[in-house]
Amino acid sequence: MNLFVALSKKKKYQHKLFAPYLRPSTDTTTTETRFMLSTCLIRNCVFIRPRLSVICFKAIRYQSKKSDFPDYTKINDPKLREIIEGSNFGTEAILKKQREDQDKKKKMEQERKRLEQEREVDRRREEKRAKEESESNKTDNDNEANQHTDDKLAKVNEKLESNFSKTESGKLRGEDTGTRETVVETEEEEELKLKAENKIIATSKDSVDESDIPNLAKEINETIQKEIAGLPSQKAKNQSKLAKNLTKYLDSAHDTILTATRALNDVTGYSAIEKLKKSIETQEDDLKKAKEKVKQCKIAYGEAIQRRSHSQREVNELLTRKHNWSSNDLERFTELYRNDHENEIHEQEAEKKLDEAESKVDGVQLKLTQSILTRYHEEQIWSDKIRRSSTWGTWVLMGLNVLLFVVATFIVEPWKRSKLVSAFEDKVKQVLVGISQENEQILDPIIEKLEPTDGQVPIKTSFDFKFVTNTWHGLKAALVRNYEALMSPEITNLEFDKFEFELFTMTVAIVAFSMGSLIVSLFK
């Protein structure tokens, strides 16, 4: 009935749509009616055909996106699953799933082998560490036992008034010189009081040892030292008191140098760089620990994934044979379904821990890199500062050397020369005055030479040192005169004007600084 009503409505709609064009034809309107009908049909085709083409194109794209072999393993209906698995498509899907499972198993097996190897290495390390700890504990126990034995031996010596000592083998040796009264029973059962001096080798309970065991280790050591001469211990014993004092002084000097070096590092700022180095080493250790933690988190995450995948695989296997379940299978399915949520939570927690560990590794790595860059930058600044300080120190030393040269040449040497000359003249005058009048004729020629007569030409002993002139020829003549005066043995004094002395000192200083700069630039 509904279908009939729909068809009737469709016919009415078509009748209304094409009613103007379906009127009885007349001779006058036939051509116009045909033209309008053809126009309507063309317009409908133009507007409807693109929509159909778009719909067809979308359907083709949707069909091309579909996989050739759908994943029928996700179908939960057992009957439909059984029908599909009986066909070729279901078999191919199962084979694909089996190949993926085999690949996962291989990867998990490789990961498991690698983890087993790492665990074996860790186990060996733990065994080695435990062995070392047991050996150290054994050594400590032996030391405690020896200490206890020594205390006990001291008490016995104090009690028995004897002198016992312990041998290398752990036994006691000594000499009991105490005089005691000993009761001896003879065959006639007579008691005799005897006094004896006993020399024994005994334990703390006065039990006699087999023999007096010598200290073999010391004897062997002495024999080796006698056979092989020049050992360090022998040299140390044979050193004189002066050599020992010298060694002690050198050790103290070494400590002083270390203290001075530490103070210099504090002043220059290198101690902070040393602290930065130690912090970098600490960060490297932290990075190693963080990487070890990431490795452990990866192992835990892999185990969680393996546990959950194994549980899901077992659930899928139970679902494949759902139609013939037993009571044990039902209980197992219930248990697996109940544990699946816990496995998922464990997997999420392991993944979260792994992400946190990896982020921590990234943070530590970034901090370590930044610390290394900071250390490099600070060391560069420190080296530049030291280089700059050494350059200024070199210039200061050069200036001091030039100043000392100028002072020694132009102040100290003339003063020393004048003092020597005056002292010599005074000495000569004293000798001349003390000579008797008998030798007056012999000393007259000498006096005449020292005090020339008025008719003689005086010998010039001083020279006015000048080299500032206005012309080139005058400068050359001044240089020649100055050179002749410097080379003449009769000239003993040089005289400078104040301006010329300042100019000469400045010239010498500039030449010295230039030579020093050239030497520093060549050997830097």
Curated annotation (Swiss-Prot):
Q: Which residues cross the membrane?
A: 392-412, 503-523
Q: Print the keywords alphabetically.
A: Coiled coil, Membrane, Mitochondrion, Mitochondrion inner membrane, Transit peptide, Transmembrane, Transmembrane helix
Which ranges does the record list as Mitochondrial intermembrane topological domains?
A: 413-502
Q: Which residues form a coiled coil?
A: 92-133, 270-304, 338-371
Q: Give ranges for the Mitochondrial matrix compartment.
A: 524
Q: Which domain of life is it from?
A: Eukaryota
One GO biological process from the UniProt record? inner mitochondrial membrane organization
Q: How does it sit in the membrane?
A: Multi-pass membrane protein
- Tell me which family the UniProt entry assigns to this protein: Belongs to the SHE9 family.
- Its protein name is Sensitive to high expression protein 9 homolog, mitochondrial
Question: Which species does this protein come from?
Answer: Candida albicans (strain SC5314 / ATCC MYA-2876) (Yeast)
